Amino acid sequence: MAIAETDTEVHTPFEQDFEKDVAATQRYFDSSRFAGIIRLYTARQVVEQRGTIPVDHIVAREAAGAFYERLRELFAARKSITTFGPYSPGQAVSMKRMGIEAIYLGGWATSAKGSSTEDPGPDLASYPLSQVPDDAAVLVRALLTADRNQHYLRLQMSERQRAATPAYDFRPFIIADAGTGHGGDPHVRNLIRRFVEVGVPGYHIEDQRPGTKKCGHQGGKVLVPSDEQIKRLNAARFQLDIMRVPGIIVARTDAEAANLIDSRADERDQPFLLGATKLDVPSYKSCFLAMVRRFTNWASRSSMVIFSMRLATASTRRPAVGLSAKAFSAWSPTRSTRGGRTASSRSTAFSTRSSRGSWRPGRTTRA
């Protein structure tokens, strides 16, 4: 389903060509391929974004069409494809040779193996927007190369040899991890464009909030409102329509594991939100801020200074008042959950006081 528009007056050949493209795009929207899909934009808006120089993304387009038909066939038969994510192009080729029809390229694989600029770790989507499309490009190139090599070798065979040698399907049936889209609508469109350009036909987009994105096994997931996720999906389909690719979009949710949401603005989310029933109890945020304020003020109350400053103060006061000063180190009370507090990279903070008696040097420790 889509919003249809008609133009009553067309004069110039340029406008006529434009209207023909709009009509063709509307027929494309209304085809059975997109039954049940509601677009929040018009065919005219899509054509306005295409320009006059056609660009054909044949690898992604052909793979998307064939992959979609295969998935619908399996769905009708109540069957599925069991697959996994390869770490290398060689593994992707081996998967195809083993009869695994589809390949899943997860952001977790990109994060886990790292790169020349990124440390390996859990999938927090902290890698650049281009990282997963670049990894996908390597897999697609490997599959296309394997297909060319197979085609050449089979041409050298006799008919009997070809009949005895299995022909593998190296079409890049890939679902790639688009994560949260890496931002707003322009970022989602940019990401989908990159996937299409390297030949990827499928993409999953999840409903976590960028910046707080967590790997599947981690807690603390924060969801965006439903309307924000819909905007992401709509932006992805808009970019695919501009590029004339019937890509496969997987709308993924982390709602099963997440217990936080970014906003309560969308009424569709409100039935699932928790609310306090005792208004005399301070809010969680107020309690948390009070706790932070309590421990933050500790730093000023404890009079933290570096030991050399305390020693200079004690040396100045001693002849002036006729008293000796005692300076001692108290490193442990200043320690946070991540380490001791420091005033610079080479000094440790100290809590100090002066008293009567002889001065003794404190033990210094580098943090």
Swiss-Prot record:
The lineage of its organism: Bacteria, Bacillati, Actinomycetota, Actinomycetes, Mycobacteriales. Together with AceAb, they could catalyze the formation of succinate and glyoxylate from isocitrate. Keywords: Lyase. PANTHER family: BIFUNCTIONAL GLYOXYLATE CYCLE PROTEIN (PTHR21631:SF3), ISOCITRATE LYASE/MALATE SYNTHASE (PTHR21631). One of its GO terms (biological process) is isocitrate metabolic process. GO terms for molecular function: isocitrate lyase activity; methylisocitrate lyase activity. Residues 334-358 have a biased composition (Low complexity). It catalyses: D-threo-isocitrate = glyoxylate + succinate. It comes from the Bacteria. Belongs to the isocitrate lyase/PEP mutase superfamily. Isocitrate lyase family. Residues 332-367 are annotated as: Disordered. Pfam families: ICL (PF00463). Its cofactor is Mg(2+). InterPro entries: ICL/PEPM, Isocitrate_lyase, Isocitrate_lyase_ph_CS, Pyrv/PenolPyrv_kinase-like_dom, Pyrv_kinase-like_dom_sf. The active site is at C215. Its EC number is 4.1.3.1. This is Putative isocitrate lyase subunit A. It comes from Mycobacterium tuberculosis (strain ATCC 25618 / H37Rv).
